[in-house]
Amino acid sequence: MSPHSSFLIKLLTVALKLLIVVLVAWFIRDTLLKAWQQLGRQTWNWQPLWIISAGAIYLLGLLPAGLYWHYVLKVLGQQTQLKNTLRAYYIGHLGKYVPGKAMVVVLRAGLIRAPRVDTALATVSIFYETLTMMAVGAFLAAGILAVRLREERMFFWGAIALMIISGFPILPPVFRFLAQLAGIGKSNESTCANLSWPGYTSILAGLVCMSVSWILLAASLWATFRAMGVDNIGLFEHGPEYLAAVSLSMVAGFLSFIPAGFGVRDLILLELLVRLFAISDATATVASAMLRIIWLVSELIISAILYFVKTK
């Protein structure tokens, strides 16, 4: 390759990275402005320490899911360090604010790229981890809503439908069939051999990891209420309600394919908060908007920190 061609490729690579950054920044700005507008002009007794706590709990809640993705990469035969996996996982969340969800895959697969990491298998692992999280979230929501909102079966059956949509592709036989249908590993024997995984053990591991994640995300919603000065809806007394509200709204938002589920996630969360906690529409609206802002700002902060972490 001539020096001129090499320089041109490097220039195009830099330009592409800058374009990705600009796209992500633009859609994050749009999401943040919409969420801020939802807060309206109502006055709340904001508690800064609880706002920070809600963000910290959210980031902690993502950790088990990131660890599960690392597990998936390892059993797929990919050699990557845990710090690199978690770095890619957290930064990759910014991609969900770009239409189509594809930017999540682009960011994660690009950041995890290494000589001993197959890009095709890395992409497969991202879909597998994400669908596992969505399936577990819908499963938990369905179980809780079947008891807590027995009179409103729409939410229960909606959770069941979402669980089937996200859970069916991760069943081992279905997963292998879909991977073959997509042509993954067709031209690489080692890649094809690694796709003999997953088994039902991986589903069990995902159930455990993702359940912990969802519980912590529910705790972040509780901390958001505390940040608003609402202290009469305790976490231990209403833990299942927090869990159902967060999980069902997030799963529905994800499967809507709208950037960050904006609108869909917020509407379902609002409706569930009103029904499960018997609070006003105004309180539920502010909680929903504030939760989105706290989570987005937390993602921006951790991504900015991790971006400058040196990787090998």
Language-model segments: residues:
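Mid-bilayer segments of alpha-helical transmembrane spans in multi-pass integral membrane proteins
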Residues: 93-102, 130-138
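Predominantly cytoplasmic-facing regulatory/coupling regions of multi-pass membrane proteins
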Residues: 1-90, 146-254, 276-312
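Transmembrane alpha-helix interface/packing and boundary motifs in multi-pass membrane proteins
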Residues: 91-98, 246-262, 266
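Re-entrant/interfacial helical elements at transmembrane boundaries that shape
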Residues: 102-115, 256-274
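Hydrophobic alpha-helical transmembrane segments of ABC transporter permease domains
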Residues: 127-149
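Membrane-interface alpha-helices at helix entry/exit sites of multi-pass transporters
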Residues: 82-87, 101-106, 113-130, 279-290
